[in-house]
Amino acid sequence: MKQRQFFGTDGIRGKVGAGKMTPELALKLGWAAGRVLSRAGTHKVIIGKDTRISGYLFESALEAGLSAAGLDVMLIGPMPTPAVAYLTRTFRAEAGIVISASHNPYYDNGIKFFYTDGSKLEDAVELEIEAELEKPLTCVESHLLGKVGRIDDAAGRYIEYCKSHFPAEQTLSGLKIVVDCAHGATYHIAPSVFKELGAEVIAIGDKPNGLNINDKVGATSMAKICETVLEENADLGIALDGDGDRIMMVNRHGRVIDGDEILYILACDAQKRGVLQGGVVGTLMSNLGLDLALQALDIPFVRSKVGDRYVMELLKEHDWKIGGENSGHILNLDHGTTGDGIVAGILVLAAMCRQSASLEELTAGITMLPQVLVNVRFEGADDPLSSEVVLAAKAEVEQKLGARGRVLLRKSGTEPLLRVMVEGDDRADVTQFANDIADAVRNLV
């Protein structure tokens, strides 16, 4: 299959005003996507965005391109990515578009697409859109132009949707929860959800200004929420990323509970209730500790390529329900078609209530092995995955680790980075091994 030039593992992403993320490309992309989607019978598209200041720019450009292709557009403003997926289904739109760079800084942005069922586009469809980008932009006749409207009650609809995943007979009364919204798309959603379910909520990262999304807050910057949980003597913390599709948690002692441990909690809870269908899908980055803990419970575990779209593919292939990434993308196909940080948090809280257990107790059966991830820029260098020097460094580390460790080298799908992951029993050794491989990559430049 031909390689994609614009789409990465999660849509199109980059620095605003440079490369892929320009207003000109967004206009053309809206038109190209509109042409491809219209051939499949699409007539209506929903557009949501996060809180980046550039969201206004790309929203207008996409809107114009889609209209030029003859598609109607419904705008919902700042809303989490999973909310766009949900609203795309409930409004019977044929596609949804999210303007977000997820956990990246404010000066980046991105564009990703959903089908009518809320699932992401396949690679083949993205290639069709890229083929249209090579053609000159045209416009349908005036009477065929798409119309544009706005959904004013989108936030309220999504809040009720999130709450519907919590058992009606349960309440969060008596729990104090710190909720970190990353100054992102969940700022007006997540605190309300958990308050309305009965919890005492302390919100942080809930004051976006267009420039502060993911800035020292959120699921990729956990120091602030860990500190706040301890200061407030809270029962737990829930950290979301800029577009609300990933979650990390914090127990009452200020320890981070990552996506692997959340998967373990959900799988154990489903098994206890007799509703676990098959096993669990993780990724190449999932901690070996998750694999071992699930083995102890006779729960099958398989690994996909990195990216929640590939987790979804394996879930469908095996007809399983639960999967995700250690970075906090959690999928439970009984509760939605895409990763949803708020809903994943609700499912963990439901398990706590059902079992009258704390986060510490729910994670007692899993021991995470030390895992170190080093990101190394290689822009302008030779392909590090083809370098004999880098491969030799990797082989040397693997020999030292033996059966109790792993090494994974993976290129980022959105940035010129090589991700060096090393896992083993001793953190000091693992850190040194990861840095040894990273140094081999740096020496290529």
UniProtKB/Swiss-Prot annotation:
Purpose of the protein: Catalyzes the conversion of glucosamine-6-phosphate to glucosamine-1-phosphate.
Entry-linked PANTHER family: PHOSPHOGLUCOMUTASE (ALPHA-D-GLUCOSE-1,6-BISPHOSPHATE-DEPENDENT), PHOSPHOHEXOSE MUTASE
PTM comment, free text: Activated by phosphorylation.
Molecular-function GO term, any one: magnesium ion binding
Organism of this sequence: Shewanella piezotolerans (strain WP3 / JCM 13877)
Residues holding Mg(2+): 102, 241, 243, 245
EC number: 5.4.2.10
Keywords noted in UniProt: Isomerase, Magnesium, Metal-binding, Phosphoprotein
Record lineage: Bacteria, Pseudomonadati, Pseudomonadota, Gammaproteobacteria, Alteromonadales
UniProt keyword RNA-binding present: no
Entries under InterPro entries matching the protein: A-D-PHexomutase_a/b/a-I, A-D-PHexomutase_a/b/a-I/II/III, A-D-PHexomutase_a/b/a-II, A-D-PHexomutase_a/b/a-III, A-D-PHexomutase_C, A-D-PHexomutase_C_sf, A-D-PHexomutase_CS, Alpha-D-phosphohexomutase_SF
Name of protein: Phosphoglucosamine mutase
Cofactor(s) for this UniProt protein: Mg(2+)
Location of the active site: 102
Residues with the Phosphoserine modification: 102
Domain of life: Bacteria
Family: Belongs to the phosphohexose mutase family.
Encoding gene (name): glmM
Cofactor note: Binds 1 Mg(2+) ion per subunit.
Tagged with keyword Transport: no
Catalytic activity, reaction form: alpha-D-glucosamine 1-phosphate = D-glucosamine 6-phosphate
GO cellular component: cytosol
A GO BP annotation: peptidoglycan biosynthetic process
